[in-house]
């Protein structure tokens, strides 16, 4: 008989995830249908989003050649029925205070920093780059982890050394670029460009660096259509940039600079976001989301 969610002690809430304790060594990592943008948790939810994120992470954890935090399969008997398909049993780790970002293309906050200073996280970039320019080699551009509701700040490698030490900082850079390259190469064979992504790492009791949290999901990555890619313009995408674009567009009526929460998402934006996330999973994995475990919304 599967345990009930109430059998486990709730430890923490994030923008999208809930964390519960199973025992001294294992946690229950639950992905909800919440969606966040611009450091706000939106009032609207995306049906099945938590299941899609979990399915995508499981696919990439299996694909990537790096130790990860999984401690059981997606149908592990320790997972309660009510969160089956959106929860994973994971190892407890000492999480490192760095958002490990890999960028293959210039966009988002990276483009903003480049236009101001010609640099990105302490790296001097060549002149003449524009929206969606591809880098000669992927860049490691770390960020500090902010508290819930605050904004992660891009930092340089020296600041990472201050946070975790020189040896661990070098290991984070190497592992981040290795994982990004492997995942992005796979995605490209499926017609998808992963423009950038972020990883989180922890350390286990033996001191081994372990990939944790989520990996290559549409929440943590920018997914572009490879056949529609054009340098110099904003790219159509599978990820939550679609939601960000609506929020900052005239249709939403939201003033991002004002101290007001974002408005609810219209039904068509919710439905289109769900469809994009499912399409990303199915194209990347070659699997049908309809066959993923757990109850559909």
Curated annotation (Swiss-Prot):
InterPro entries from the UniProt entry: SAICAR_synt/ADE2_N (IPR028923), SAICAR_synth (IPR001636), SAICAR_synthetase_CS (IPR018236)
Gene Ontology MF annotations: ATP binding; phosphoribosylaminoimidazolesuccinocarboxamide synthase activity
Lyase found in the keyword field: no
Keyword set, alphabetical order: ATP-binding, Ligase, Nucleotide-binding, Purine biosynthesis
Any one of the GO BP annotations: 'de novo' IMP biosynthetic process
ATP-binding keyword on record: yes
Name of the featured protein: Phosphoribosylaminoimidazole-succinocarboxamide synthase
Record lineage: Bacteria, Bacillati, Actinomycetota, Actinomycetes, Mycobacteriales
Recorded name of the encoding gene: purC
